[in-house]
């Protein structure tokens, strides 16, 4: 009888330890401390708008998403011990999806602005960009944004490029869901210019767009990209900032940067 009692005590101790390990394993990556207990597995639900090469784009003939942002968020997920699941959605749908809890993270070349910081939590900056004007290659009349007054301008909805276009006097601004559509409208003659982020337009030109288009003027309004989370998810924001700092310290960030942009900016 004594042996049976001792065996049962050892069994109960082992069972409690196993249950504690299971409880730790099922804590989710994206939630707060309370929300984490309800997560079935360690998954970081990420969303992006995949027409913003070289930051995020869909590989030709594949459903796989590639780009600087995609490599970066996967590296952050690895630091956090999370499985990263990435969904596609329109750029203007990203912040609403965060606020409704449908996703944990949005990364899509998203500029850190005061307006966005009112709506969501923004990480420390991970890339510095700026805006540039693109016109057709044979257009010699438009030399800078100062020449766009009264012209037809294309931009991507919900972006700082759209804000800049709307600030041009008497301009007729057409907003598109994707950067690809904006560039196509320029090629087809539907607009006189496109305003978008400099690295995105630069990548488009490098991939063959230079045969039909060119940039004019200087890079405008240096802006920094950040990773967005739900406003009250401070724990996840802290974890992302910590992971980002570690990636910069251990050289992994520089490795990813060099893959997509060549020489590393110091």
Stretch-by-stretch model annotation:
Residues 1-43, 265-266:
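Short, low-complexity disordered leader/linker segments with a strong preference
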Residues 50, 128-135, 198, 202-244, ...:
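Periplasmic-binding protein-like
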Residues 38-109:
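Extracytoplasmic small-molecule ligand-binding "clamshell" domains
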Residues 45-48, 66, 145-158:
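Short loop->beta-strand "edge-of-pocket" segments that line small-molecule binding or catalytic clefts
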Residues 31-34, 160-176, 212-219, 242-266:
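Ligand-binding clefts/hinges and TM-proximal coupling segments of bilobed small-molecule sensing domains
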Residues 70-79, 139, 157-159, 226-264:
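Extended ligand-binding regions for polar small-molecule ligands
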Residues 78-79, 87-88, 92-105, 119-121, ...:
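Short helices/loops that flank or line small-molecule/ion binding pockets
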């Amino acid at each position: 009888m004594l042996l049976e009692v001792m065996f049962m005590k050892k069994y109960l101790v082992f069972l409690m330890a196993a249950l504690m390990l299971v409880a730790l394993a099922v804590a989710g990556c994206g939630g707060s401390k309370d929300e984490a207990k309800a997560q079935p597995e360690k998954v970081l639900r990420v969303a992006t708008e995949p027409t913003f090469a070289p930051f995020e784009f869909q590989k030709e003939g594949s459903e796989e998403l590639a780009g600087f942002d995609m490599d970066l968020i996967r590296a952050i997920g690895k630091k956090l011990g999370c499985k990263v699941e990435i969904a596609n959605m329109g750029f203007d749908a990203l912040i609403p999806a965060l606020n409704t809890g449908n996703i944990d993270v949005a990364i899509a070349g998203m500029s850190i602005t005061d307006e966005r910081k009112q709506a969501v939590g923004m990480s420390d900056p991970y890339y510095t960009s700026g805006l540039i004007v693109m016109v057709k290659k044979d257009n010699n009349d438009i030399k800078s944004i100062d020449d766009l007054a009264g012209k037809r301008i294309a931009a991507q909805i919900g972006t700082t490029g759209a804000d800049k276009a709307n600030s041009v006097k008497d301009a007729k601004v057409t907003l598109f869901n994707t950067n690809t559509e904006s560039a196509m409208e320029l090629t087809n003659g539907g607009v006189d210019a496109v305003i978008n982020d400099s690295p995105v337009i630069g990548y488009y030109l490098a991939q063959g767009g230079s045969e039909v288009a060119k940039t004019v003027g200087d890079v405008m309004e240096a802006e920094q990209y950040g990773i967005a989370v739900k406003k009250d998810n401070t724990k996840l924001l802290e974890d992302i900032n910590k992971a980002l700092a570690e990636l910069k310290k251990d050289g992994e960030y520089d490795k990813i940067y060099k893959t997509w942009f060549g020489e590393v900016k110091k």
